[in-house]
Amino acid sequence: MRAPDFWYTPPQAPALLARLLQPFGKIYGMATARRLAKGTPVKLDVPVICVGNLNAGGTGKTPTVIAVLTTLMDMLETPHVVTRGYGGSLKGPVRVDPSKHTAKQVGDEPLLLAAFAEVWVARDRAAGCAAAAQGGASVVVLDDGFQNPSVHKDFSLIVVDAEKGFGNGRCLPAGPLREPVDIGLKRADALLSVGAAEAQARFDSSTLPTDLPHIRGALTPLQTGMDWSDMRAIAFAGIAHPEKFFATLRALGANVVHSEPLDDHQPLSTALMSRLEADAKRQNAQLVTTEKDAARLPNSFRTKVITLPVRLSFDGQENALADLLRPVVKS
């Protein structure tokens, strides 16, 4: 499912459907608040760093987790990731093994993250964090889980798409929010907005807590030596905002002769891939997708599709993430 357009109308001028759904949004927000108030969070013997969001859907969270992992490893830490494994069938806790697990079992994001660090899939986040700590983690990176009260977080980093912001400011299903912005940011330790300079400038003009550390980053294509200029490409993406992936390809100079937006985490069936392959042959084009989608490719198509990896960069704030995390792991 892709986010509906009415989620991202201006808060001061919400769409009719957002206004009609507003009572349900209030109920959702209250349900989140009640869930957060329940029970006592489990505190581990190792720090837990949560990378979460207030919005449903893509905010740049996965590249942020990768950036957090590399930053922690630069500090000589041994981070393990704990994630729910959205789209996978295994309940866990289970340590992800890319040599034997598939996206159908553990989800696409865990397979992608497993290239950088040990990853645990667990529907029960507390059990997953405990397994990671027992498995040798010196610090646990909780992928999502900001609205999960079962685990004590030593540091919570909220990620937001600078272009989309917090949408129309309403909770699901009236808007994209899992909880009201003001309530969520009060529990956060820092905010990371992801986007180009123009989007960052617009986001900066919105009302944010002045005492909350705010760092800015952008998703930039990883330099792999691939010459994208004038490449005829058929691009497909099953992520929250596939249009951003297509725009990135065009910005690199690729001639995107066809773009196929898919639902977030949509299974890449053999029938779908065979159709795209036939289109590519007919138009003398190359199939291109995202790293996350590549994790869901049928084995027979893995050598036929090129991926465009992106990483989080911090222009002028290269040490900002390390400065935030160092006190957490060195305390």
Swiss-Prot record:
Catalytic activity: a lipid A disaccharide + ATP = a lipid IVA + ADP + H(+)
Entry-linked PANTHER family: TETRAACYLDISACCHARIDE 4'-KINASE, TETRAACYLDISACCHARIDE 4'-KINASE, MITOCHONDRIAL-RELATED
Lipid biosynthesis keyword on record: yes
Pathway noted in the entry: Glycolipid biosynthesis; lipid IV(A) biosynthesis; lipid IV(A) from (3R)-3-hydroxytetradecanoyl-[acyl-carrier-protein] and UDP-N-acetyl-alpha-D-glucosamine: step 6/6
UniProt keyword list: ATP-binding, Kinase, Lipid A biosynthesis, Lipid biosynthesis, Lipid metabolism, Nucleotide-binding, Transferase
EC number in record: 2.7.1.130
Listed GO CC annotations: plasma membrane
The organism of origin for this protein: Roseobacter denitrificans (strain ATCC 33942 / OCh 114)
Binding residue positions for ATP: 55-62
Protein task: Transfers the gamma-phosphate of ATP to the 4'-position of a tetraacyldisaccharide 1-phosphate intermediate (termed DS-1-P) to form tetraacyldisaccharide 1,4'-bis-phosphate (lipid IVA).
InterPro entries cross-referenced by the UniProt entry: LpxK
One GO biological process term: lipopolysaccharide core region biosynthetic process
Name the UniProt record assigns to this protein: Tetraacyldisaccharide 4'-kinase
EC class of the enzyme, as a word: transferase
Pfam families listed in its UniProt record: LpxK
Domain of life: Bacteria
GO molecular function, one term: ATP binding
Recorded family membership: Belongs to the LpxK family.
